[in-house]
Amino acid sequence: MSNINQQARDVFLNLFILEMANNHWGRLDRALKIVRDHGAVARHNNVRAAIKLQFRDVDHFIHSAFKGSTNHRYIEKTEATRLTRADYARIVKEIVAVGCVPMATPFDEASVDLCVELDMRILKVASSDANDWPLLERIASTRRAVIVSTGGTSEKDLDDLVTFFENRNIPLAINHCIAIYPSDDGELELNQIDYFKQRYPGHVIGFSTHEYRDWQASMYISYAKGARTWERHIDIDHEGVAVSPYCSLPEQIDQWFKAFHKAREMCGGTQDARRVLPRREIEYLDALVRGVYAKRDLEPGYVLSGQSFKDDLYLAIPLQRGQLSCREVMNGERLVKAIVADQPLTVDHIDGPYSESRTLRDLIFNRGYAPSDDEA
């Protein structure tokens, strides 16, 4: 991730997107409860979360000849779940109040203007709109950070979209998405995360999921593969309103967040540099390293070499305090002090950096076995 610019990191890195969609069912009170319940879970798990709304200019989004249609589920649900601008403003205020980031998917140009009016920090391009160029142009004109979902989108269309936002220097994250509602485990295609990382190396890659059987396994896998933003639909079990199987309840989102923390713990630090080695690990391995012992009595002036080492010295456990190990013995080192058979070869026996440097000397004397260890 070292080639992703700092602005994109600040916006997208380890961001969870909680998609409310139309699960408010046109009721402000239900929308506010969704925000509060899921916001509390995000706060309790110490994660950065955006709660995402969907905006449509219903008066113009639906063709006049089809308004009121009950034969088209998308049209019927859009009309049935309509909220006012004032309602949306109140929801956004609540999103901020619970410590989450306000975010929206605009499905038409007028809705982009509403995003600006309500100061939505991040805009989302739905999979269905990845090549809706009038909409993309309007979204880009806001100069706001953008996340795009890629379900059902061709490679050519994705390349064009990514180039479009790159040319305008607009922060863009790319979500691997399977637009199947709900998705089974065998449909998740998580190897696509690797594909997106390789094809679009300058962007944060995410995973937008509609699975419904598990809230942990795909988090472990997607995090390990390098996804750094995630999205799920959210809802609440309240007042008998049916919950779609691809939507997650607060207790399931809690599992999801905890899986993130576990994945992060298990994967460790940066992938761009060697990890910092914990002292406990080093001390454990030092106890397994062989120390150098004399096969016979040796006098001062004796010079270590590859052949003489085989003839006159041997390696065995335990490595004792102050003793040189198989790691430190080098050709040309000279004994400055006599050593008897089966005695450990220590820092005090030879010349060289480990006897001359206080820091290196302390390193040798602070590791390995000491008789006092048996008393501890």
Language-model-derived ranges and their functions:
Residues 1-376:
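Catalytic cores and adjacent flexible loops of soluble metabolic enzymes
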